[in-house]
Each structure stands twice: as structure tokens, then as C-alpha cells.
């Protein structure tokens, strides 16, 4: 069996790229680091026979590509309104690739989908919640990856509990405190 590979592509909105603090913002989204997070998440899921995955969507020894797009509140709000009917800038949106298995089998890297992150909202939430920006970004990206893999906490309490359990375990492996515990 060949070693699975995880390719992460991070892009930034043109408006955000012109921000005075762009260099600091860009450092928050290192492709190699996020690829490691994906590898650790998939390793964890592989070892969890109880973890459910939407319609057997993912074979965890496959090589994957993950795209992240970091944007502004204006664009995040428009996307949230267009695709979810919610008129506010949200922290993260997940757009799964949902390729048919016969197509995915032909590709060297299976696209998981795209995570759209509004950095300003994430930064504001981290400050409000008394969390480090790095810890909050890590949590949200792990959360978004789970959505791309077919997990959905909006289906009910059992699904929410399962997602949170996985997030807490993977974040602990990454040295990040439980984001659901009040500080």
C-alpha cells in the first residue's frame, strides 16, 4: 500500500491580501501544518470503528487535497447568505467535493472540498472567548474537515456529541485544549 498524501492549498481574497497585517494573517494558515492536522484527523478516524462517516464517503488510506480560502467579513457574509440563507459573516463555511466514487478512484488526489474562513470573525471570536487565535483556528479547521468528511452536528445531539468527541481527541493530540470547556 502506498503512503497517503495530503495536499493543502491556501488562498486569500485580494482584499485581505492588501490588509496591513497580511503577513501575520498568512502565518496563521501554513499549508504543511494544516496537512499534518488532516493526517492526524484521518489517523484518529481510522482507529475509531464507531466513528460514522457519511455513506462510507471516505477511504482513509487515500491521498487527499484540501483547499482553504481565507476571506473578509463582506465576502463571508455574502457566501453565508447565498448558500445558507443567513445574513451575517460566519467563521467558517464548508463545501464538500462529494465526488462519485468512480471519479474519485481515478484521481491521484481526491479533493475533499473547500473551507472558507473569515479571519476577522475568527480573530474576534478568539478574543471574546479568551482563546488563542492559533487554538481557535486549529479547532475550526478540524471542525470544517469533519464536515467535508460527511459529519454534520446539525442532524441531532448524537451527531453533535460524536463530532465534539472527535474534535476534542484530535485537538488534544495537537496540544490544543478542549474548546468546549469554559475557561
Locations of regions flagged by a protein language model:
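Short active-site segment of divalent metal-dependent hydrolases/proteases
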Residues: 142, 146-147
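An acidic/histidine-cluster motif and surrounding catalytic segment
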Residues: 1-138, 149-183
Amino acid at each position: 500500500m502506498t503512503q497517503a498524501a495530503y495536499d493543502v492549498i491556501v488562498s486569500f481574497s485580494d482584499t485581505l491580501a492588501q490588509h496591513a497585517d497580511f503577513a501575520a494573517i498568512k502565518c496563521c494558515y501554513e499549508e504543511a501544518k494544516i496537512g499534518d492536522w488532516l493526517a492526524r484527523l484521518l489517523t484518529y478516524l481510522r482507529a475509531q470503528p464507531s466513528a460514522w462517516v457519511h455513506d462510507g464517503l471516505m477511504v482513509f488510506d487515500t491521498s487527499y487535497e484540501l483547499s482553504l480560502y481565507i476571506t473578509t467579513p463582506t465576502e463571508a457574509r455574502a457566501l453565508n447568505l447565498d448558500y445558507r440563507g443567513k445574513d451575517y459573516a460566519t467563521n467558517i463555511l464548508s463545501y464538500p467535493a462529494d465526488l462519485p466514487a468512480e471519479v474519485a478512484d481515478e484521481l491521484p488526489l481526491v479533493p475533499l472540498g473547500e473551507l472558507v474562513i473569515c479571519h476577522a470573525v475568527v480573530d474576534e471570536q478568539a478574543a471574546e472567548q479568551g482563546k488563542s487565535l492559533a487554538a481557535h483556528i486549529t479547532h475550526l479547521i478540524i471542525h470544517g474537515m469533519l464536515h467535508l468528511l460527511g459529519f454534520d452536528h446539525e442532524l441531532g445531539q448524537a451527531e453533535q456529541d460524536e463530532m465534539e468527541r472527535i474534535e476534542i481527541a484530535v485537538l488534544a493530540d495537537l496540544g490544543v485544549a478542549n474548546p468546549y470547556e469554559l475557561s
